[in-house]
């Protein structure tokens, strides 16, 4: 039995989101193909993920014997909790829109909890080495324009998850803002792709 972590990176519901429509279709198809697997869901917009602000970063570099505030201790514990949640999953699926050429800020904060030295990668004399080998990561993204996987959001997500050694792949639905009349056609193609991916993911 494997564990799938489902990461919702959109502030709205599937009624207003093509990426979440794809995510819902993926999860439904995945459950049918892998009925014994455990599925855990994470909504980054309601999870109160700590951001890398002054309070958190200063706590990270304070040292073992430093006196931390209760708030700093809480942020460190919650940050580590999201790291461990990612590590405990065998597979991860992430769905998000592209906002201003990038992923939403809340999703970026979650990604920061995933990219952790000593946990998901390590430094060696030959350079950094990923520690998340064998972990499958599927990225579902909706782009209003057509970017052909060359948008900064895709490049960033690919760079991070390849850096930590995971088996990263992406399925995008794009062009619906450029040509709204084709939205249903584009969505149908997207759904077909994610349902097919779910069979063997």
Swiss-Prot record:
Q: Pfam families under this entry?
A: Flavodoxin_2
Under Gene3D superfamilies, the record lists:
3.40.50.360
EC number, as in UniProt: 1.6.5.-, 1.7.1.17
Q: Which cofactor is recorded for it?
A: FMN
Q: Which reaction does it catalyse?
A: 2 a quinone + NADH + H(+) = 2 a 1,4-benzosemiquinone + NAD(+); N,N-dimethyl-1,4-phenylenediamine + anthranilate + 2 NAD(+) = 2-(4-dimethylaminophenyl)diazenylbenzoate + 2 NADH + 2 H(+)
Q: Which residues participate in FMN binding?
A: 17-19, 98-101
Keywords of this entry: Flavoprotein, FMN, NAD, Oxidoreductase
Which SUPFAM superfamilies has this protein been placed in? Flavoproteins
Cofactor: binding details: Binds 1 FMN per subunit.
Q: Which GO terms describe its molecular function?
A: electron transfer activity; FMN binding; oxidoreductase activity, acting on NAD(P)H as acceptor; oxidoreductase activity, acting on NAD(P)H, quinone or similar compound as acceptor
Q: What does this protein do?
A: Quinone reductase that provides resistance to thiol-specific stress caused by electrophilic quinones. Also exhibits azoreductase activity. Catalyzes the reductive cleavage of the azo bond in aromatic azo compounds to the corresponding amines.
Its subunit composition reads: Homodimer.
| PANTHER family cross-referenced by the UniProt entry | FMN-DEPENDENT NADH-AZOREDUCTASE 1, FMN-DEPENDENT NADH:QUINONE OXIDOREDUCTASE
Q: Which family does it belong to?
A: Belongs to the azoreductase type 1 family.
Q: Could you tell me what this protein is called?
A: FMN-dependent NADH:quinone oxidoreductase 2
| Organism field | Lactococcus lactis subsp. lactis (strain IL1403)
Taxonomic lineage per UniProt?
A: Bacteria, Bacillati, Bacillota, Bacilli, Lactobacillales
**Gene encoding this chain?**
azoR2
